Amino acid sequence: MTEQKIPRATAKRLPIYYRYLNILLDADKTRVSSTELSEAVKVDSATIRRDFSYFGALGKRGYGYDVESLIKFFKKILNQDRLTNVALIGVGNLGHALLNFNFHQDGNVRISAAFDVNETIANTIQSGVPIYPMTDLRTQLEEQQIQVAILTVPSDVAQSVTDDAVAGGVKGILNFTPLRITVPKDVRVQNVDLTNELQTLIYFLEHYNSKE
């Protein structure tokens, strides 16, 4: 299969499919239809079939999809066989929560290094993760060859910290700050604005009738 770029919306749905397929496997279910998958993950079946079509013939008409085969396929696509080390930059309230969580449900992702300006927690180990002073950011990123970072620092330093992280070799940033950071073209940023998401949810609750 030749590698091709798929739509971003499709790429964001792949981990959702993969996680539910693992639930089916644990329940000893051997196959699933696009309709069943649709009901479980709340994505319409036509979209699921279109998403899967980007990767060729993954199912059979009248049979559906083989659960184990799909898991093996998406495991490869999502690099689930490879451990990805992640840097946590900023160990405040949100950072601490992420540090304690540390993606225990996902065996292929882990926070392996954290950074903070607070001298009382720098050079300590919390939840099994070493916390380095922010002055060591670039050096440690380079030495540990970490390419993915979670950014949970105050907005007023977000850009400068981002610049240091990129200089240290980071290619992907999960940005929890309200600031829309600027990065080179070869660096990918995913923005997670919890306030914005909550305000959007409230808007839909107030302006859209769920019974319609």
Swiss-Prot record:
Pfam families per record: CoA_binding, Put_DNA-bind_N
InterPro entries: CoA-bd, NAD(P)-bd_dom_sf, Rex_DNA-bd_C_dom, Tscrpt_rep_Rex, WH-like_DNA-bd_sf, WH_DNA-bd_sf
Keyword Coiled coil annotated: no
Any one biological process term the GO annotation gives: response to redox state
Quaternary organization: Homodimer.
Function of the protein: Modulates transcription in response to changes in cellular NADH/NAD(+) redox state.
Name this polypeptide is given: Redox-sensing transcriptional repressor Rex
